[in-house]
Amino acid sequence: MANSRSGDSMTERIVRVLDTFTTERTMQTATEIAERTGLPSSTAHRIVGDLVTAGLLERDEEMRIRLGMRLWELALRGSSALRLRQAALPHMEQVQTVIREHTQLAVLEHEEALFLERLSHPDAGANITRIAGRLPLHASSSGLVLLAHADPALRERVLSLPLRAVSQETVTDAAVLRRLLTTIRRQGYVVAPGSIEQVSTGVAVPVRDRGEVVAALSVVLPRESAPAPAVDALLAAARGIEQDLRSGR
C-alpha cells in the first residue's frame, strides 16, 4: 500500500477511519471522521467514499456514516470468536437461570478485555460492559483472569504501565496486582468487589480450549450478593464450554 506524506500507509489510514467508531459512537459524518482521524478532509472523505462503495461503511438518508454489514460478514467468516461464542452461549444461558444478573464472555485483545457476549436479566443491577466493548485488564474480573493466564511478557508489560483507577477499589499497585494474579492462577477464579463500580462485584473464571486459556466467563453481581453460587455456576459452565470446544460442537 502506498504511503501518505505523513508516512502512513493506506491500510493504516483505513484503520484510523474504522477506529473512530465505538460502541457509543455508531454514527458519524464524514467531516467528523476527518476531524477524529486527523487526516486531511479530502483524504478522509475519499477513504469513506471508497469504504461505502465496498460495503464496509454505509450512509443513511441523512448522509451519516455507520459500519456496514459487509464488515460484519467478513468478521464472522471463520472467526475463532464466533466459534467460541457459539460454544459458550448455551452455558451462559444456564448460568443466567441460576444467577439472574449479568453473564459475560470476554477475550484478550490488544492488552484489553474485549467482550464478545453479554446476557442480562431485566432486573439486573449496574454494569458498564457492552458487547464489542473493552475494559482494562487490571480493572475487571474478566480482565484479571485473562491477565493472570496471559503470556508472561504481556503480563509484565501491563504491570510496568501506569494502572488507571476506574473506581476507588481498582488495584493500581503493581506488586499487589502481581500477587492477586498468582492467587487467581492457583484458585482458578477471581472475586473482584468494586473494581469497576463500587455497587457491584465481578466474579470470573478462565475458559480453556485444549489446555490454553482462550476466554474469561464472568458475572456481575450486586455488592451484597454472596459470590459462592456464582463461582460454582461459572466453573460448571466453563467445563461445559471446554467440552464443547473439544468436541467441535
Model-identified regions with their sequence ranges:
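Amphipathic alpha-helical effector-binding/dimerization core
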Residues: 63-161
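Short, basic/aromatic recognition patches
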Residues: 87-95, 158-203, 240-243
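Juxtadomain coupling helices with adjacent low-complexity linkers
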Residues: 174, 180, 187, 198, ...
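N-terminal helix-turn-helix
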Residues: 1-81, 242-247
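Short amphipathic alpha-helical signal-transduction/dimerization elements
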Residues: 22, 143, 147, 151, ...
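Sensor-regulatory modules in signal-transduction proteins
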Residues: 207-209
